[in-house]
Amino acid sequence: MFTLRFDMRAPDWAGPPADLYGAAIDMCAWAETRGAALAVLSEHHGAADGHLPAPLMLASAIAGRTRTLAILLAAVAIPLWDPVRLAEEMSVLDLISRGRVWYAFGVGHRREEFEHFGVDMTTRGRVADEMLAVLGPLVRGEVVSYRGRQVRVTPACATAGGPMVLIAGGSKAAARRAGTHGFGFVSQTALPGLKELYESECRAHGHEPGMIQFPVEGAPTTVFVAEDVDEAWDVLGPHLLHDAIMAASYRPGDDSVASISRADSVAALRAESGGPYRIFTPNEAVDYIRGGRLLPLHPLCGGVAPDVAWPYLRCAVAAAARAQG
């Protein structure tokens, strides 16, 4: 079993964006009957390499080409959205996908993105809590009082109770937010005490703790599978390094997030012991999956051209099938 992640980075020297978007949709359609458990789409704005800014739109295209594949949007920076408009898009996407799209909401962390939308970053926590309080009722079609006006979103979503919502973050504030609102919690860090804080906040507000996920020490977050690992690093290395450098630039001075690498060369990235970027042999991929873990594939990482990406994806899927055999 494996997951697919798409950030849609397209640096100038990589594949054309239109080809990458088409390939992402094709890959999801192809992979859903071959062991794909989940497609993960991220959201960032104003990035020099075109990082995906509209995950709900891409999710809609993927949902239209698939029938069973779950799609997680992680993380959506909720203070950058208008809650009424977001609820409308979530409701329609829930209808299109028949409930297969889930959301991990965060408060955002790049000052440039708040400036991009003219939003005050210093109020992001308060704004997020205000929006989370009304978003659920809105997608369920209830009348909501929001900032002095009565609002009702139509059509209501198809999923009873609304789409699955998680809170993404790695801080005590994120754990409290998830518990207060009764949502699941996806932590990007392994900060001690977060799990206990989340569970206590849930129960203090009348909720049973929901889905919870923490990073596993030494586990990769981006994987390719290749028969010839040396050749694969030669081909894929510049793309993986670009992804690593860009992701690290989003979090200057913050090394607490499991997916962040500070490598400044392909050699350094490859040499990281237990680092987030790995290229497995098929046998290593089989062993990883048989250890009870999902293989986190990132087929178009750093703008890998589709004709280059497909053979690596097929190799990974073949290994996943063998692991299940």
Regions found by a protein language model. Give the residues of each.
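An alpha-helical appendage that flanks or caps ligand/catalytic pockets
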Residues: 4, 33, 122-155, 194-294, ...
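Short, small-residue-enriched loops and turns at beta-alpha junctions
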Residues: 12, 46-50, 78-81, 252, ...
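Short, acidic/polar
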Residues: 18-30, 89, 169-176, 281-289
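Internal, glycine-rich beta/alpha segment that forms the wall or movable "lid"
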Residues: 82-181, 186-201, 205-213
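Generic C-terminus detector
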Residues: 296-324
